[in-house]
Amino acid sequence: MAAIHQKFGRSIPLSAMFEYGSIRRLADLLRADADAPAATPLVSIQPKGKKPPCFFVHPAGGNVLCYYDLARCLGTEIPFWGLQAALGEGGVAPGSIAKMAEIYLEAMLDIVHDGVPILGGWSMGALAAFEMARLFHQRTGVAPIVAVLDQIAPDLTSDSTSGSEDLTAKLFAFANKVSELVGHDIGLSKELLAASSMEETNSLFLDKFKAFELAPEATRVEEFQGFLKLMLDHNRITGEYEGGLYPGRVLVFRAEGKMSGSTSGPG
């Protein structure tokens, strides 16, 4: 998408990458006079099938590409949708998990008019999916199954950051998470981050993301700074979420391996 914007000056939503799933079809879209499909939280990753659809909420950072392989493994009998955060101009993160869940539930109900969906998510997305299920139950009296991928109970989560922590501490915590993800120290020390302006910090992180192939080479600093702000906002609301009672089934899926520093298990 960054390369398309750089080359053609056109911004298209992630949903178009799945809907127009070939170079030829994307070219037709770019040639058309009509604008690209309107931005929406809903991303149709695998639209086929007549079984109850799955709706998986993005983790912190807002992207649902992490669910592509999962949707593929589930086959073509189960429609699979992602709920992706808005990352464009004016795309501000909701102020709480509860508000996020409300927005995403409304988007889901635009296309789900009967039946009971399956809700799920990875990391922060699991909390938003759980809250969506609570709201769905409050409205309909029906409790959907919730699939929780590698996310523990809110009061035990290692992702939380207190309001008293300064920006440097939050950025350093994020740098440590990236180091765990790639299996190497990415070299962003607390001292370096403290001495850097926010503009410099965006460039530092983007350079590391490109070096470890976490971001395309064509990604611009302007695009990345929106992602970094969204990541910090998501980490904040994750730490503030307290959850609540839910009468439905919650299925917890955990990876066999564990990153260093992660909490031992779900609460």
For the regions a protein language model found, what residue spans apply to each?
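A hydrolase-biased, glycine/serine/histidine/acidic-enriched motif that marks catalytic-domain neighborhoods
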Residues: 24-267
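Phosphopantetheinylated carrier protein domains
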Residues: 1-21
